[in-house]
Amino acid sequence: MKPAIALEGISKSFPGVRALSDVSLALYPGSVTALVGENGAGKSTLVKILTGIYQPDAGTIRLGDTETTFPTALAASRAGVTAIHQETVLFDELSVAENIFLGHAPRNRFGLIDWKQLNADAQALLGRAGADFDPTIRLRDLGIAKKHLVAIARALSVDARVVIMDEPTAALSHKEIHELYDLIERLKADGKAVLFISHKFDEIFRIADRYTVFRDGAMIGEGLIADVSQDDLVRMMVGRAVGSVYPKKEVTIGQPVLTVSGYRHPTEFEDINFELRRGEILGFYGLVGAGRSEFMQSLIGITRPSAGAVKLDGEVLVIRSPAEAIRAGIVYVPEERGRQGAIIGMPIFQNVTLPSLSHTSRSGFLRLAEEFALAREYTSRLDLRAAALDQDVGTLSGGNQQKVVIAKWLATRPKVIILDEPTKGIDIGSKAAVHAFMSELAAQGLSVIMVSSEIPEIMGMSDRVIVMREGRVAGRYERSELTAEKLVRAAAGIETQADGRAA
């Protein structure tokens, strides 16, 4: 079978960095190819070349039997190449339908936008993407997961022969993920060539037919997914066997550091109570929309609770803003790190040291050497992949930007750190590094709240787990009694067979 599109001998360099070196990739009609690699391996650069955002320094692109170039993103789109990115650009002030058909809206015989047709077509595309909401509503009124479905519908609006999905399930619920799997099967049946980029091996082995592995900008291997194991892919990705992805150290849990009592919000959550102890990793699990992130944002002063009390080291604490939380020793690493954490246009080292300038200044003057030393300490412990610390953080891959944000808040030397989806979008090698660092911090006496939607991560790293459902605590479990079934039942409100009650 001939590839729908093939890249041959592609190379691309940026100042100080060789992003791709003589790589090749072939995508076949009716087949899903998984592109696998650590953050910084070159996956994002290749996707940008495929979609006309970057131009290769060397190599060729073949569309069917014809050699071609994509000088612009529009040229790639017109050639039938479309992409669903982790951070697909959408516009909050436009309607869902307008976002879907931006740049190629249906028009009537007078050349004006046919709004009735546009909304009808948008509704049909949303249905194909597994969404059932009104296409006329403003995008700003949707949550993260639904915005992601709009991005999928937008990609489907172009009659593409090649569909690129870059971490498409990152913000989706379990139900939406299964609907996406069904959509991919329909794309295959329609003869589309699908490039699937994911760090979740269960997804890769469920839906991919072929694989291609990148490491440090080079292609390491390719073939049929049926011919490899997860361990094989890991070894190709990192050049070594990754020991334990969840290196949880056994530590002596101390006295309560943070106590939360009767915390509630008019619309997001109610009656949240718990204690967080010194050296403990407390996991918060739940499905999308359970209220975990909303509660954490209220806890650190982004939103105001309607009732409740917080004590830190036994002292009542009133937090009116994130700045007050940071001064008290509570920091929050958000889920949307690209939008809420990293400052694009600023160097890596300044991103890391920005909240910690009191540690790197003397008599009101910044000391550059101390800034670099502080940034180097925390970025190296998280295995950041960057050419230099004065590099613009915007040039890093998404996973490495996440590491910069985590390093930034750890550098403040807090008492409590809240990590919201700490390894979302991070490759398996980097996950192990982040988990090892979390375990080390807990062993040193730092108290950690970890919000995660990944059951293996929750079970592998937590000393205790609180499950939330619909803004309430639905279950509490010690590490010794954790099972995947208990977590899922509590999160979904599934009745236990033993007593007929919801978990």
UniProtKB/Swiss-Prot annotation:
**Cited Gene3D superfamilies:** P-loop containing nucleotide triphosphate hydrolases (3.40.50.300)
Task: Tell me the residue numbers annotated for binding ATP.
Answer: 37-44
- How does the protein associate with the membrane? Peripheral membrane protein
Which keywords does this Swiss-Prot/TrEMBL entry list?
A: ATP-binding, Cell inner membrane, Cell membrane, Membrane, Nucleotide-binding, Repeat, Sugar transport, Translocase, Transport
Annotated compartments:
Cell inner membrane
Q: Which GO terms describe its molecular function?
A: ABC-type D-ribose transporter activity; ATP binding; ATP hydrolysis activity
Task: Kindly indicate whether the keyword Translocase belongs to this entry.
Answer: yes
Q: How does it assemble?
A: The complex is composed of an ATP-binding protein (RbsA), two transmembrane proteins (RbsC) and a solute-binding protein (RbsB).
Q: What is this protein called?
A: Ribose import ATP-binding protein RbsA 1
* Protein's gene: rbsA1
